[in-house]
Amino acid sequence: MTERELLKDKKRIVIKIGSSSLTHAETGDLNLAKIEKLVRIISDMRGMGKEVILVSSGAIATGRQTLGGKKPETVAEKQAYAAVGQARLMMVYQKLFSEYNQTAAQILITKATILDDTSRTNAKNTFNELLKLG
């Protein structure tokens, strides 16, 4: 059975995309053609009634490229790059999804979110509400 056949009957699909899939290896720039293709595939899946959750890396890589910095070595450098990169990444997702009349949302989850019962429940409820709203 192929991967497509396995997904055919699934209602909810989670897609994890890493930094290397979002950026050009040579330059570190966002690979907008690849991201646009991903957005188109997700929009098509949603059009078929699938609930799709995109788990996206890339904030640090995008921030590093935007700021023209070296590879981050400290937590502070990683957080600074991520702060800039996450905003840029979400801007790209918002723009591309809007071309398909789709809305992108962002939920930031940490290990602490998962470990704390209240935080985990709140995150779960947020996911369910977003999926319900479409």
Describe the residue ranges of each PLM region.
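Nucleotide/pyrophosphate-binding catalytic subdomain
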Residues: 1-134
